[in-house]
Amino acid sequence: VSIAVTSAAIGSVAGKFVEKAWNLGEKWITEYFKNHGKEAQEKAKENALSFLTKVAESVKVIQDNTKTDPVTLEVINTSFKDPDFSAVLQRAIIISARTPSEDKHKILARLITERLLANSEDMISLASSVAVEAISALKAKHLYALGLSVLVEDIRPTSVPKGLTQKQLNQAARDWWLKNLSPLIHKVEDLSDIDIRHLVGVNCIEYELFIGRDLAQILKSGFGEWEVDKFLSEIEEGKKLKEYYEK
């Protein structure tokens, strides 16, 4: 894959990021894989370029959907002068080079994009390094399991309309959970006890987080009283979520 063609196709600012990152990344990959076979080295470069392309696409989406211009050439140039950003980017490129997984590439790309926009000492910056390292120790299904856990435990709609009838509230809550569960729940169907133990072992989750928790009460949070028991017993996504939490 030609880096020049890739960066040109993506656009000016995002493309510049790819060029600058690849100028460094190719050297990092060459050094890391110097004692490996030629085919492994070439595949590593292909994987890393796929990841960088996803970073650029992520940057472009932010540019296109924001009235301001959050990612400028100045922001990019400043980031590459930051030792912490450079170290996080290096680790992300090496991790991406070791796998063809698009799921991992997308998540790494999101992390690097968020880090690109963050101040050097805020929580996003501090968490980025930890998150990148965690990805290196996880399979894609583990990442989906973590995403599902965060969704169920922490994420709720910013607001629920006032004055809904019980029927309307039941429908609103059901629709919200279906929309947000659907991309994740089918990705963790084959998650085993060994997978859960692995997540505990790499300090991504704690068993105590789930002990004694009533799933129905968790799903009511943010909505109030709605037909959650019916959702968990009759709707496919609800039944799968219940099975997942009972593992």
Can you describe what each PLM-predicted range is?
Residues V1-L49:
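Membrane-inserting effector segments that mediate pore formation, membrane fusion
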Residues K43-Q90:
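Amphipathic, membrane-inserting segments
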Residues K81-Y144:
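Long, low-complexity, charged/polar intrinsically disordered regions in eukaryotic proteins
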Residues V132-L138, L143-L148, V152-L169:
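Non-catalytic interaction/regulatory modules that flank or connect domains
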Residues S136-K139, N170-K179, S221-F231:
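Eukaryote-specific, cytoplasm-facing alpha-helical/coiled-coil scaffolding segments in long proteins
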Residues T165-D190:
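Short helix-coil junctions and helix-kink-helix linkers
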Residues S182-Y244:
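Short amphipathic alpha-helical interaction segments
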